[in-house]
Swiss-Prot record:
Protein name: Agnestins biosynthesis cluster transcription factor AgnL10
Free-text function comment from the UniProt entry: Transcription factor that regulates the expression of the gene cluster that mediates the biosynthesis of agnestins, dihydroxy-xanthone metabolites.
Natural source organism: Paecilomyces divaricatus (Penicillium divaricatum)
SUPFAM superfamilies with a match to the protein in the record: Zn2/Cys6 DNA-binding domain
Bias-annotated ranges (Basic residues): 57-68
Start and end residues of each stretch annotated as Disordered: 54-83, 188-209, 294-318
Gene: Agn10
Compositional bias (Polar residues): 74-83
Length: 404
């Protein structure tokens, strides 16, 4: 392909042609050309003819843009015909677009006063209050909003407003804590006094395991009624439990202790000591109930609301029969308590129950055990076992004397 050449001796290139920046000899040799016309430095030094070829893309002709481009027309005249009238709100004239009804700007003459003034700025010079803004803030809430820090005078018109410092009063926190404690105690006493209810235990917790055993034993010890009852009684203040409720509560406690002792995981000496105290409390409850029941001589205090007071029944046959009935019921429960004492004695003799001297040749796992490092003293368990058997013999002898 031949390109039109322009030498140094020729005139300026014809209109519409553009010459290359590099001459032909420099372009073929791929050497940077000095781009000097009519002859570059390399061609002038070698005394060669310097020729510049025309570029492959000729320049645009002058005046072509003016003839090719159409005359622009206003876009506002073509929009209604070019696009369908699906959204007339955006295509119509802004003056014809319907606006939502709003209050005119003149209805808020005091909104941000002096904000466009140059001389002074009242928003900075004076503090901002609710009087400065004439906007109806109360329409956003169901009840009026009181801001005492902004306007103290408006607080007198709100009789139902509660001061914030009233919530931090120490007496209120004490009342809330007392009410919570009373509700918890009422629930515990109602569940313990119900004969139809089973042994007290958490509903979702398993009935086995040392930790669960401790929790269950402590719950039974806390929920068991106190065996001692004051002689002065006010019927309107503290109603006494009946003998039936006390017998049912003790029976449930004995059944729960039996379930825990029959589990092989309850070999912990501390847990056995707690169960021993539970049995002692049950025996004390039986003894107190037996001694406060009116006997043939009219002594004692009536626990059961169905029996007449001691002053009215005296040494009648009804009082003697009631005392014998209570004694027979307690005697029917003592054989279960005696069985628990026998099981406890066997558990006291196992390695986990009694204290023993740590062996120096034992492994690290045995020495790290709490029962090995800090065991329950054997003398304490022996005293507990002797006390249980003594209380059981004493109570049995009293019942036999009543039934003779």
């Amino acid at each position: 392909m031949q390109f039109p050449l322009a030498s140094a001796h020729e005139d300026s290139p014809p209109a519409g042609l553009k010459l290359r920046d590099s001459c032909n000899r420099c372009a073929v040799s791929k050497i940077k050309c000095s781009k000097e016309k009519p002859a570059c430095a390399r061609c002038a030094k070698q005394d060669k003819v310097c020729e510049y070829s025309a570029t492959k893309r000729a320049g645009r002709k002058r005046g072509s843009r003016r003839h090719n481009n159409p005359v622009p027309s206003p876009t506002t005249q073509d929009l209604p015909t070019a696009a369908p009238s699906t959204c007339p709100t955006f295509l119509e004239d802004p003056e014809t677009i319907p606006l939502s009804p709003r209050p005119p700007f003149e209805s808020y003459p005091d909104l941000f006063p002096g904000i466009f003034s140059i001389g002074d700025d009242p928003l900075i010079a004076t503090p901002i209050t609710l009087d400065t803004f004439s906007f109806p803030f109360d329409s956003f809430s169901a009840s009026p909003i009181s801001l005492p820090t902004l306007d103290v005078s408006d607080g007198d018109h709100l009789p139902d407003a509660v001061p914030l410092n009233h919530l931090n009063h120490p007496g209120d926190r004490t009342d809330v804590a007392r009410a919570t404690a009373l509700l918890a105690s009422d629930h515990a006493s109602a569940s313990s006094m119900d004969p139809a209810a089973g042994p007290q235990r958490p509903p979702d917790e398993p009935s086995s395991g040392p930790i669960c055993g401790f929790i269950r034993a402590l719950g039974l010890l806390n929920g068991l009624s106190s065996p001692a009852w004051p002689t002065s009684h006010h019927p309107g203040l503290d109603p006494r439990p009946s003998s039936r409720s006390i017998m049912a509560e003790n029976e449930q406690t004995v059944r729960a202790i039996s379930e825990m002792l029959h589990c092989q995981c309850f070999d912990d000496g501390y847990l056995l000591a707690i169960l021993s105290m539970l049995i002692l409390k049950v025996l004390s409850s039986y003894a107190t109930l037996l001694r406060q029941t009116p006997g043939p001589d009219g002594d004692g205090v009536s626990w059961d609301n169905s029996t007449p007071p001691p002053g009215e029944q005296g040494a009648g046959v009804d009082g003697e029969d009631h005392c014998r009935t209570i004694a027979q019921q307690i005697l029917g429960q003592l054989h279960r308590v005696q069985r628990l004492v026998s099981i406890l004695s066997q558990r006291f003799n196992i390695p986990g129950g009694r204290a023993r001297t740590p062996d120096s040749t034992a492994g690290p796992d045995l020495l790290s055990s709490i029962e090995t490092l800090f065991p329950v003293p054997g003398s304490m368990l022996e005293q507990m076992e002797g006390l249980l058997r003594k209380r059981l013999r004493t109570l049995s002898a009293e019942i036999v004397d009543i039934l003779r």
